[in-house]
């Protein structure tokens, strides 16, 4: 949404009276602790820890934070918004003028105009220095951020996009895909082994053509109806991804696409998207998508719970390492499952064009932003810390801890110490380390999500099977892309990040309403004809105005 905000004389006037009108919350002298160290108030959603992974909230009281405090002459005071109300908490903080020195917000295309861009205009957040040459590691990371220019306003960048994986910046596809019950496929093949005319449904390396995928689903349906005793179903999607079948048809992932002339159009009314909806509708009619999918909600997490209980054959979700590991752990507790690898195998489906299809993604997620009123000294300290944590030395501190106590380097290899890394006595495999708070790792999340060190993080060892499965799938998709066998479904960047008055305000509404109408059309409740679906989607009044504004900007 590259936008030129032409403040002109008005901006000059505003800045001249910034003490009266600036929207940052904490103008005035910097504060210091009893040791004379500069106090930094930093907020990040990842500081909140994780109940699922038994990780407590980061409070800044650990040894490694103190090492950073001493190194940089600061006193770090971390806080975290609630993950469940992250956007609302940050927006309320900014509106209420209670912004910390550093804030973390889930900036994305659909909320760009009503958050980031608006906060720049109101002088709530501060631009990064034009010259980042003093922070070479940070500069190197930013050089690889996708669509970085879209985030610049008048040539300035107002925050740090948090990189997904600084070791793999070229990955432009999401982890939103299928897992399936390979053990069901094996069982079905075994049941039919005596039939000389039977063709096995299980495919090598879990790769299925479109026809083979449909045959697999129908075989699962027969299996569920005739063999299973529980309330089993065939194919389920996370509600935000329903119907996932459209991925193999649509040319854009969400609201906006381009027609042959380059005009912006409503993606939900294109022939490609409707063809995908109607294919999904046929899956509903055939019982491949269950009736209960219609009632699934993100709040209740129905789809995850269904698959985790062992009651579904195929599941579509965002399979990050964390999400995939969580699902594996849940299935391991199921006494009816003998082999968890077979219960949660990655299902690789090729569309009718012979290609895999995955939604595209930016190579970053959310942004670290600075209070407009933060002093230059404070801002530079935060940038110094981030740059250090992106260095080899800082990364080692984040991953292993303190050299000489937590680990030693022997023959150029890191060797963990027993004092620094205590094994969990309850894990008979000997792979699990007792969790310890490491502020360096937490603070590093202000710049990157830590996927660059997952393969050598000691904590990964306890979930090495999950990590191996996810990385193997990712590498296979990267190879498929290189070979021209992966279609990455991207929204054109000039549409995605474009800023117009109605688009800024209405995109989330357009997305939610259009997807809801798509679900109603798939289930014919109540939209039982294509005409009714089209009328419902086009009837959302903001569509016409939004597209008109966008095409005016495109000169179409």
List the model feature ranges, each with a label.
Residues 87-99, 113-117, 212-220, 300-315:
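Short helices/loops that flank or line small-molecule/ion binding pockets
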Residues 126-144, 187, 191-194, 254-272, ...:
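Short, solvent-exposed loop/beta-turn-alpha elements that line the ligand-binding surface or hinge
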Residues 239-260, 281-441:
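Extracytoplasmic/periplasmic substrate-binding proteins
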Residues 18-22:
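C-terminal motif of bacterial Sec signal peptides marking the signal peptidase cleavage site
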Residues 388, 392-520:
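Conserved small-residue motifs centered on glycine
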């Amino acid at each position: 949404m590259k936008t030129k905000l032409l403040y002109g004389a008005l901006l000059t006037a505003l800045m001249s009276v910034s003490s009266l009108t600036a929207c940052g919350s904490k103008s005035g002298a910097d504060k210091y602790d009893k040791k004379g160290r500069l106090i930094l108030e930093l907020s990040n959603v990842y500081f909140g820890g994780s109940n699922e992974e038994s990780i407590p909230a980061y409070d800044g009281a650990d040894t490694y934070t103190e090492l950073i405090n001493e190194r940089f002459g600061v006193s770090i005071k971390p806080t975290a918004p609630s993950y469940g109300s992250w956007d609302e908490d940050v927006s309320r903080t900014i509106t209420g003028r209670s912004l910390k020195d550093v804030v973390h917000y889930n900036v994305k295309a659909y909320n760009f105009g009503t958050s980031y861009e608006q906060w720049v205009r109101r002088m709530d957040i501060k631009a990064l220095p034009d010259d980042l040459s003093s922070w070479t590691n940070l500069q190197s990371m930013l050089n690889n951020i996708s669509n970085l220019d879209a985030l610049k306003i008048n040539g300035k960048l107002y925050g740090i996009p948090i990189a997904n994986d600084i070791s793999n910046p070229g990955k432009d596809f999401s982890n939103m895909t299928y897992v399936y019950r390979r053990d069901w496929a094996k069982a079905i093949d075994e049941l039919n082994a005596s039939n000389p005319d039977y063709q096995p449904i299980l495919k090598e390396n879990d790769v299925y053509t479109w026809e083979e995928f449909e045959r697999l689903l129908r075989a699962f349906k027969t299996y569920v109806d005739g063999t299973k005793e529980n309330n089993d179903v065939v194919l389920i999607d996370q509600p935000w991804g329903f119907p996932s079948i459209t991925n193999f048809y649509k040319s854009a992932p969400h609201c906006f696409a381009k027609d042959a002339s380059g005009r912006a159009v409503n993606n939900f009314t294109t022939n490609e998207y409707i063809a995908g909806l109607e294919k999904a509708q046929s899956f509903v009619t055939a019982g491949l998508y269950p009736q209960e999918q219609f009632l699934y909600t993100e709040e209740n997490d129905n789809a995850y719970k269904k698959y985790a209980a062992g009651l579904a054959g195929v599941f579509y979700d965002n399979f990050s390492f964390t999400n995939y590991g969580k699902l594996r752990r849940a299935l391991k507790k199921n006494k009816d499952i003998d082999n968890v690898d077979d219960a949660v195998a990655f299902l690789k489906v090729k569309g009718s064009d012979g290609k895999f299809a995955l939604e595209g993604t930016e190579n970053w997620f959310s942004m670290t932003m600075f209070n407009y009123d933060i002093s230059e000294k404070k801002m530079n300290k935060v940038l110094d810390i981030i740059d250090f944590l992106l260095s080899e030395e800082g990364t080692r501190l984040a991953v292993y801890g303190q050299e000489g106590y937590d680990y030693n380097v022997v023959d150029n290899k890191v060797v963990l110490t027993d004092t620094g890394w205590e094994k969990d006595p309850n894990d008979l495999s000997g792979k699990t380390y007792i969790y310890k708070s490491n502020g360096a790792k937490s603070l590093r999340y202000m710049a990157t999500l830590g996927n660059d060190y997952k393969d050598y993080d000691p904590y990964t060892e306890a979930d090495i099977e999950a990590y191996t499965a996810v990385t193997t799938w990712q590498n296979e998709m990267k190879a498929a892309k290189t070979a021209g066998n992966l279609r990455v479904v991207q929204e054109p960047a000039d549409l995605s990040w474009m800023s117009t008055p109605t688009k800024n305000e209405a995109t989330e509404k357009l997305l939610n309403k259009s997807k809801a109408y798509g679900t109603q059309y798939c289930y014919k409740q109540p939209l039982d004809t294509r005409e009714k679906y089209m009328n419902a989607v086009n009837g959302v009044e903001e569509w016409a105005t939004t597209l008109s504004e966008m095409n005016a900007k495109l000169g179409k």
